[in-house]
């Protein structure tokens, strides 16, 4: 779902994945072409101490990214799928100092065999990126019913050589920061659910 994924002028250690393009910037370096720079690829896998029914909503609901992803100043959903209300087009606005970028992506949220979930975000515009692909693969932990395996796959190439150079330095760190932000978000959602008073006749 989400062309979520994650995100701004990719030049600071904290925002890359879930995101999509549609650039509105106070300052950019799009005049510097990307040359022969290769597409960058990052893969990160973690175990979250929460079942999928907490993880999947955190990843798929792009409109709430602004609440927990560093430097994400806005997040929104333009289109949703009839029936389950999952996002099909979403975006992020990321700002840091004089940089301000907005990204819009096509989002695809699907259920896979083995009770897995997939959230894929692909860029819709190409004035900032040559390519941008973000995928979250969410799986039940094979031996721990109360845990999930979360894998983030990120592929991108900027049109700006400067952005490509800077992101090649910070890419690994950015991916880790994004993953950590989602882990904290899932922990928060689970804690809120556990702290919520039971419904029904519990007070009688």
UniProtKB/Swiss-Prot annotation:
GO CC term (a single one): mitochondrial inner membrane
Q: Which residues constitute the organelle targeting sequence?
A: 1-24
Q: Name one Pfam family in it.
A: Polyketide_cyc
The record's listing under InterPro entries reads:
COQ10-like, COQ10_START, START-like_dom_sf
Q: Keywords assigned by UniProt? A: Membrane, Mitochondrion, Mitochondrion inner membrane, Transit peptide
Q: How does the protein associate with the membrane?
A: Peripheral membrane protein
- GO biological process per UniProt: cellular respiration; ubiquinone biosynthetic process
Localization, per the record, is: Mitochondrion inner membrane
Q: Does the keyword Mitochondrion apply?
A: yes
PANTHER family the UniProt entry points to: COENZYME Q-BINDING PROTEIN COQ10, MITOCHONDRIAL, SPERM PROTEIN HOMOLOG
Q: How does it assemble?
A: Interacts with coenzyme Q.
Role noted for this protein: Required for the function of coenzyme Q in the respiratory chain. May serve as a chaperone or may be involved in the transport of Q6 from its site of synthesis to the catalytic sites of the respiratory complexes.
Provide the protein name.
Coenzyme Q-binding protein COQ10, mitochondrial
